[in-house]
């Protein structure tokens, strides 16, 4: 595997590339980490990307503007530019554009959902982990966002969502439930896994991504990843 980074046109934004040479074009996932627009959560980034590459995916991580440069619209632009770059370089990156999707965690889930609902989206599938859906925590994050559930249409790509019912940062009723209701109303295929308990910001929920914060290791919630792979094989491949 070769790891590289390219700068995007959006200032303070770049794309980490985890490319595995392949004789055939592979599925690919664009990872949009969380971090409340204050940081790029490393727990959601390289270790998630490397895990995807071990399952025959090409993987990418979008680094969008954060801290004093944080801006919701700029972050959305960075995600769109990342997809444009990958599709434009699909041959050399061994990517199958028909199996290219986005996965977002927390605030990154908000960005992933927003991008997937653009009319020009290049995402063929979406995965959202404990996503921010409504602008209920804008003050905490220091940005002005939007209610991405209102962006859903019948053209929204098939979506996989997971989180925990007792998530105190993105409460189920305000966020995941609001989004899945709109998916159902528009006839968008989706699969939802809301675990009974579990922390926010849990990434893969295993010891690999929870190496620093052991409270982010949860054997039960870690089931989301094999469930996603099963869903992908049935719905997308």
Whereabouts are the PLM-identified features?
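N-terminal cap/lid segment of alpha/beta-hydrolase-fold proteins
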Residues: 1-24
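Short beta-strand element of the alpha/beta-hydrolase
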Residues: 25-34
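The serine-hydrolase catalytic nucleophile loop
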Residues: 39-47, 172-175
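Catalytic nucleophile-loop/oxyanion-hole region of alpha/beta-hydrolase
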Residues: 41, 63-97
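Short amphipathic alpha-helix adjacent to the substrate-entry channel of hydrolases
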Residues: 42-60
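Primarily recognizes the serine-hydrolase "nucleophile elbow" in alpha/beta-hydrolase
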Residues: 81-148, 154
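The feature captures the conserved acid-bearing segment of alpha/beta-hydrolase catalytic domains
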Residues: 125, 131-186, 191
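C-terminal catalytic histidine-bearing segment of alpha/beta-hydrolase fold enzymes
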Residues: 186-237
């Amino acid at each position: 595997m070769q790891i590289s980074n390219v700068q995007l046109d959006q200032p303070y934004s770049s794309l980490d590339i985890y490319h595995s040479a392949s004789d055939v074009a592979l599925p690919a996932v664009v990872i949009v980490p969380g971090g409340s627009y204050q940081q790029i959560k490393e727990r959601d980034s390289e270790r998630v990307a490397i895990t995807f590459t071990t399952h025959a995916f090409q993987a990418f991580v979008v680094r969008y503007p954060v801290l004093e440069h944080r801006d919701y619209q700029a972050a959305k632009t960075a995600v769109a530019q990342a997809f444009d770059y990958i599709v434009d370089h699909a041959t050399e990156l061994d990517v199958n554009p028909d199996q290219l999707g986005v996965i977002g965690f927390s605030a990154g889930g908000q960005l992933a959902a927003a991008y997937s609902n653009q009319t020009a989206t290049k995402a063929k599938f979406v995965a959202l982990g404990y996503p921010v859906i409504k602008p209920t925590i804008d003050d905490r994050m220091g940005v002005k966002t939007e209610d991405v559930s209102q962006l859903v249409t019948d053209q929204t790509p098939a979506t996989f969502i997971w989180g925990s019912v007792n998530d105190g940062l993105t409460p189920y009723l305000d966020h995941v439930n609001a989004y899945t209701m709109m998916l159902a109303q528009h006839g968008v295929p989706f699969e939802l896994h809301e675990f009974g308990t579990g922390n926010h910001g849990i990434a893969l929920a295993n010891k690999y991504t929870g190496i620093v914060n052991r409270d982010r290791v949860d054997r039960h919630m870690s089931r989301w990843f094999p469930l996603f792979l099963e869903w992908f094989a049935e719905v997308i491949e």
